[in-house]
Amino acid sequence: MKKSILVLAVALASASTLQAKELEVYGKINVTAQSSDEGEGRFTELKSNTSRFGLKGDYALEDGLSVTYQLEWEVDPSDEANEKNIKARNQYLGLAGSFGEVRVGRHDSALKMSQGKIDLFNDYEADIKVLWKGENRVSNSISYFTPSFSGFSAQVTYVVEDSPAGEDGISAALMYGDDGLKNSNVYAALAYDAEVNGYDTVRASGQVKVAGFKLGAMYQTQESTSTTVERDGYLVSVAYPMGKAELKGQYQVMEDDNGFSAGVDYKLGKNTKVFAWYSSFDFDEALDKDYLAVGLEHKF
């Protein structure tokens, strides 16, 4: 069934390209060969790191409005073909205008989006979600994005709990600057989750560009809504470009658990890179883990 959906999406994209310039077909394939030790011995594996395929675009309406849309799936070219090979990612229908934009469907929460590009090992083994809660892509959600005012913008995500026993959730974030540090040298954000996937979470994020270095930091406190157990942690990251290469490192803590990562990316072209990284985790109540990987990524 999932394969049929993807084939239909490709067919629709091919047909629609002739009629609407607003449609964009895009994707990313990221694969690593890695040596992994998850506490019970070392082994070798091939992994797809959130490779994806999607369609997105907008269509102009009357009165300064436009309809926006995105349909995105995660694919796994390293795994055997089965029903788990395709997974839904952000998929929504929206309406945009001078008021901002409203999106309805499955979408990254405001707190998740607020971290910008600070997590330098996003989608890899050292993704911040290993130690932290809050990296939620929520279904049954309504998201509102404000226009930018003097560099400030905000996002609010309302999560509908479709059962009498559940509590609706709210995720909100206030951002300043450019999260890619392309149009400004500063990015900062403050975000809050209430009753989102069983946690109340506060996250503060910041990143600056100084003398070529990208320096990032995050602080988070999270509390389980079922057990009231509260935990705190922080993250620091640094990246430095050297010609076609970029060196990067990151350290993350959540209470007594911590992780360290170091890596290098090397551009082979505008949309293609090779890379290598090492990540190590020290857990207080679980087996320690470490990974060494080399990989290739291409975007289209």
Describe every region a protein language model picked out:
Residues M1-F300:
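Outer-membrane beta-barrel proteins
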